[in-house]
UniProtKB/Swiss-Prot annotation:
This is Phosphate import ATP-binding protein PstB 2. It is a peripheral membrane protein. Its main location: membrane. Gene3D superfamilies: P-loop containing nucleotide triphosphate hydrolases. It catalyses: phosphate(out) + ATP + H2O = ADP + 2 phosphate(in) + H(+). Residues 22-263 form the ABC transporter domain. Belongs to the ABC transporter superfamily. Phosphate importer (TC 3.A.1.7) family.
């Protein structure tokens, strides 16, 4: 089934052998009695970008929050099934939450810098997990800011408040804060939805660079963005996984009509 809509130019399908970093098997999620995610099985290849797409309320962000168990901060929410990280089930009650937070970082839709200096925004998480010298901390802070393509813009005002940065800079600061802990997986929940086009382009370029070191899962409503930056795409609808595969295949020759209808704008 070839689409007539040629507006998208997806990244070419990944041809190299892949290793799954995270894998979901038979995952269900409940908000109280409401069944929000239904029997989802899919995997996220190591050091690739996987995009979650679908209409509002389809379960994309909920699925993302299962991957680091952040839902446990709220009452009456529960997940069943298996979510493995390097073969270990992170839904196991005995799995260390501190270890999970260090291994799986997250950046939210709206930039949320801490009300402290730029330097301390980066150092905060490191101090919580590690004991290192001031000199080592200085290096880690610089490395994180460079990783987020922010160092040159803030190196002379590290003691200034992170809240004083522009929206795009704040989002890159949040990305720097996440990567400072050297996680293995980075979760991005619509990280550019509140940004202007120039800031969005910077974040997209950043994602392309970061995947050399991290496995990235991104939620986006922007079809062009998904086609530009992801290696794999999962289409969700009403809490179910409809289709998942290499981005080029999903956008150029989807196997399910509902997927085609969504990415060509027939509903959304």
């Amino acid at each position: 089934m070839m689409l007539e809509n040629k507006a998208f130019e997806p990244r070419p399908a990944h041809s190299a052998p892949t290793v799954d970093k995270m894998a979901l098997t038979g995952v269900n999620f409940y908000y109280g009695d409401a069944h929000a995610i239904r029997d989802v099985t899919l995997s996220f290849p190591e050091r690739q970008v996987s995009a979650l797409i679908g209409p509002s309320g389809c379960g994309k962000s909920t699925l993302l929050r299962i991957l680091n168990r952040i839902y446990m901060l709220y009452p009456k929410m529960r997940a069943t099934g298996s979510v493995t990280l390097d073969g270990q089930n992170i839904l196991d009650p005995g799995y260390s939450m501190n270890e999970l937070r260090a291994r799986v970082g997250m950046v939210f839709q709206k930039p949320v810098p801490f009300p402290m200096s730029i330097y301390d925004n980066i150092a905060y998480g490191i101090r919580h997990h590690e004991r290192i010298s001031k000199a080592e901390m200085d290096v880690r802070v610089e490395q994180a800011l460079r990783s987020a393509a922010l160092w040159d813009e803030v190196k002379d005002k590290l003691k200034g408040s992170g809240l004083g940065l522009s929206g795009g800079q704040q989002q890159r600061l949040c990305i720097a804060r996440a990567v400072a802990l050297r996680p293995e997986v980075l979760l991005l929940d619509e990280p550019t939805s509140a940004l202007d086009p120039i800031s969005t382009a910077k974040v997209e370029e950043l994602v392309a660079r970061l995947k050399t070191d991290f496995t990235i899962v991104i939620v986006t409503h922007n079809m062009q963005q998904a086609s530009r930056i992801s290696d794999n795409t999962a289409f969700m609808y009403l809490g179910e996984l409809v289709e998942y595969g290499p981005t080029a295949e999903i956008f150029q020759s989807p196997k399910v009509k509902r997927t085609e209808d969504y990415i060509t704008g027939r509903y959304g």
